[in-house]
Amino acid sequence: MEAGRGAPAAVRAVTVCVARGDPAMELTLVVLIIVVGLVFDFTNGFHDAANAIATSISTRALTPRIALGMAAVTNFAGAFLGTEVAKTVGSGIIGAPEDLSGLLLVMCALLGAIGWNVFTWWRGLPTSSSHALIGGLVGAALAASATVHWSGIVDKVLLPMLLSPLVGVALGYTLHAAVLWTFRHAAPRPLTRRFRLAQTVSAAAMGLGHGLQ
């Protein structure tokens, strides 16, 4: 019975501290959010970052060790080269309260995104960690009765999410057809070396792009 009553008591204690704006609770939540944020970044890495180098390894354009090193460097560099996606996620999706309840909201959103990343990784489902985080933020905001910027979600999340596969299909088809026509009379052996180099460059660009997001 005592253990059964412990959890509700803990929840009530956290709620009271949040309502009072307890500095100790605020510091604790900030530290927890940093830790949970790093865990989310880790799941984001093993969930999405490997996609950029998978084909380079499978075609033997790169060895696994070199490909992993390149992915680490390009993703790390990309994180410092752009902040537009971070700005969108930080302020364009929801209006989080500027108190302890806002910190709780962010932590719950991160935990939800981590759970989805782990589940989809376990099931082998190709999903986006960015969209998982946005979904976590919206869900946590709705539960907390916080502001959700629906126009921003439609313009910056839903429309790009729907258009990106279509644009990818069109560009992929066009580029592949152009490459096949351009090199239709080329000798296979030197062409293979060039394509492996091009694949390495494209994998590095994908890693950089993933880091930017």
From Swiss-Prot:
Topological relation to the membrane, as annotated: Multi-pass membrane protein
Annotated TM spans: 23-43, 66-86, 102-122, 134-154, 161-181
One BP annotation, GO: phosphate ion transmembrane transport
Subcellular location: Cell membrane
Pfam families recorded: PHO4
InterPro entries to which the protein is assigned, alphabetical: Phos_transporter
The protein's role, per its UniProt record: Low-affinity inorganic phosphate transporter.
Annotated family: Belongs to the inorganic phosphate transporter (PiT) (TC 2.A.20) family. Pit subfamily.
Protein name from the UniProt record: Probable low-affinity inorganic phosphate transporter
